[in-house]
Regions:
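Secreted/periplasmic carbohydrate-active enzymes, especially glycoside hydrolases
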Residues: 1-157, 162-165, 187-188, 203-204, ...
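Substrate-binding/catalytic cleft of secreted carbohydrate-active enzymes
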Residues: 129-134, 142-315
Length: 315
């Protein structure tokens, strides 16, 4: 809470939690005072008995109303958010657990670019929802935001439709040694986590820069920043198993059985680390010829897409 007025303020933070039928299930408040120009964090606890838990096949959402009121009980500011109650745990060799139980279903997913024909990335909210609906109807359960945070409308759709989301820091194949570059990435990560941390669809965070050769201390710093901005349980970060500083991450992305060989085909598994196949069957040849069976050749028409589909069918 930040007091940007020219005088001191005394009041309270008040919250109300409603179920999907509009019934109030919990409420509370906490008084506070702020001098002019000052800011503070106010924490208000909440205990919900027998909650409806969020999960992909039953994505139950509550409505949270938060108000700032003055000493005369006038509403000065506030917001409303849909939230879900759930726990996610990555337990190394014991796999992924949701709401205290091993998750029994295949974690099939895709990378999603925020893009549509003609309009580019200027998608309407309805197009974001349409994308999420089609992906969920196709049987997908995990979406990786490639390679930047997606529009809030897409995150809202994933909350509503039951899709896990891997949230990515904006950045791709570029590093600058100037200190200001890392500082701006750190700011991006803080803003990203603050914006999306209350979405039940957030499965894990990818706070590194995609396919980028960054310094090892950068890897440690981004994990520390993530936990500063989300200092609660069920907060996980992932990176490539071959990346610098991967020892700071509880989740490693590997590419087993995809024909690439090399370090991504991990031979020695750490039972404390969770390994996730981020790209399945992604057979890149030399990155130049564009004749990989799993990627679309950069030429016009449907032929390259049909070749890609045939390649995946044979994988």
């Amino acid at each position: 809470i930040r007091n940007v007025s020219s005088k001191s303020f005394s009041g309270k933070v008040e919250y109300e939690l409603y179920d999907r039928n509009g019934n109030k299930v919990q409420s509370g408040s906490k008084s506070f005072s702020l001098s002019k120009g000052k800011a503070r964090t106010t924490t208000v606890g909440m205990n919900v008995e027998n909650p409806h838990l969020w999960e992909p096949d039953s994505p139950y959402l509550y409505q949270l109303h938060v108000y700032i009121k003055d000493k005369n009980d006038n509403i000065i500011d506030g917001y409303r958010r849909r939230i879900g109650i759930r726990s996610v745990e990555f337990k190394g060799k014991d796999g992924f657990w949701l709401n205290g139980k091993p998750y029994p279903y295949p974690l099939i997913g895709a990378n999603r670019h925020q893009d549509f024909a003609v309009v580019g990335n200027a998608l309407s909210n309805s197009l974001h929802w349409r994308d999420a609906k089609k992906l969920r109807d196709a049987g997908l359960r995990v979406i990786r935001n490639a390679h930047y945070p997606q529009d809030p409308a897409f995150m809202d759709a994933c909350d509503e439709l039951g899709l896990f989301v891997i949230v990515n820091t904006p950045g791709w194949q570029f590093w600058n040694d100037a200190p200001i570059f890392a500082q701006r990435v750190y700011n991006d990560i803080r803003n990203m986590v603050r914006r999306d941390r209350n979405h039940p669809s957030v499965w894990m965070w990818e706070p590194i820069l995609n396919e980028t050769w960054y310094p090892e201390d950068f890897a440690k710093n981004v994990v520390d920043i993530l936990h500063e901005e989300y200092p609660y349980p069920y907060c996980y970060a992932g990176c490539d198993v071959t990346a610098r500083g991967s020892e700071y991450f509880p989740i490693h992305f590997t590419h087993p059985l995809n024909g690439e060989g090399g370090a991504f085909n991990t031979k020695t598994l750490n039972p404390e680390i969770s390994y996730f196949t981020r790209e399945w069957g992604d057979n890149v040849d030399d990155w130049n010829s564009h004749n990989s069976p799993s990627r679309v050749n950069r030429v016009w028409g449907e032929v390259p897409m049909l070749i890609q589909a045939q390649g995946y069918a044979k994988t």
